[in-house]
């Protein structure tokens, strides 16, 4: 009997360890995740957050709330190298997303955006910022609990896992390692679950001539596209 209990316990421990092991692709994709620091006009820090690159030229997605009222911003990669945020390419205050151009001296690592939306029950993984040579030790792992329409062909997702403090705006991936969303808190204040706004939607944003006097953009002192 004791032997059976021991075998069952050992099996449980092995399963738990396996379930908590980060997918192999995370070690590669972590290079595209950066920290963001925005500054006021007097040079003092306004906000800190997370962003991630979606092409090798330095296009980055992040949260609009991190940039609102900012006069300057920089990003820092896992190796401690900093780059200036050059331009705002598009923004949506309602859904708290922003698209930016970062000035980098060379091509950067970036995340592939999922071409297809996820459906209820599919696995979802969140990758926080991880420093250079560190392994991914903490990450979000769960399922898509609910899918709602955002705009046009874009979606908003409810996820089965709660967010840690430093996970806000981190990229959320499908099982293949393609990013499909930016992590967001539950607006109701509950901590049992989290949400993800479509990364494809954020990447579709652009600035038009009609936005010249739009407060969404005039509240940010960084150059617009």
PLM feature segments, named:
Residues 4-13:
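Sec-dependent N-terminal signal peptides
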Residues 20-27, 108, 132, 179-225:
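C-terminal cap/linker of serine protease catalytic domains
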Residues 17-46, 221-225:
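Protease-domain processing segments flanking chymotrypsin-fold serine proteases, especially trypsin-like
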Residues 48, 55-107, 119-120, 188:
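Catalytic-histidine neighborhood of serine endopeptidases
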Residues 34-36, 51, 58-62, 85, ...:
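Terminal peptide-recognition signature
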Residues 20-23, 38-57, 63, 81-84, ...:
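A conserved glycine-rich beta-strand in the N-terminal activation segment of trypsin-fold
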């Amino acid at each position: 009997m004791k032997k059976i209990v021991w075998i069952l316990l050992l099996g449980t421990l092995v399963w738990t360890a396996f379930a908590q092991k980060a997918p192999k692709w995370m070690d590669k994709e972590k290079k595209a995740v950066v920290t963001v620091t925005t500054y006021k006009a007097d040079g003092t820090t306004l906000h800190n957050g997370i962003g991630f690159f979606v092409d090798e030229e330095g296009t980055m997605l992040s949260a609009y709330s991190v940039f609102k009222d900012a006069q300057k911003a920089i990003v820092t990669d896992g190796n401690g190298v900093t780059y200036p945020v050059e331009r705002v390419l598009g923004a949506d205050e309602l859904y708290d997303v922003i698209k930016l151009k970062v000035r980098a001296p060379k091509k950067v690592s970036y995340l592939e955006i999922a071409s297809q939306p996820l459906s209820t029950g599919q696995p979802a993984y969140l990758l926080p910022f991880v420093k250079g040579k560190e392994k991914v030790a903490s990450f979000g792992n769960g399922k898509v609990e609910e899918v709602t329409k955002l705009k046009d062909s874009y979606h908003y997702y409810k996820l089965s896992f709660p967010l840690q403090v430093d996970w806000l705006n981190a990229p959320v991936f499908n099982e293949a390692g393609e990013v499909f969303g930016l992590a967001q808190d539950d607006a109701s204040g509950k901590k049992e679950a989290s949400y993800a706004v479509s990364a494809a939607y954020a990447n579709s944003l652009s600035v038009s001539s009609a936005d010249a006097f739009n407060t969404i953009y005039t509240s940010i002192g960084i150059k617009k596209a």
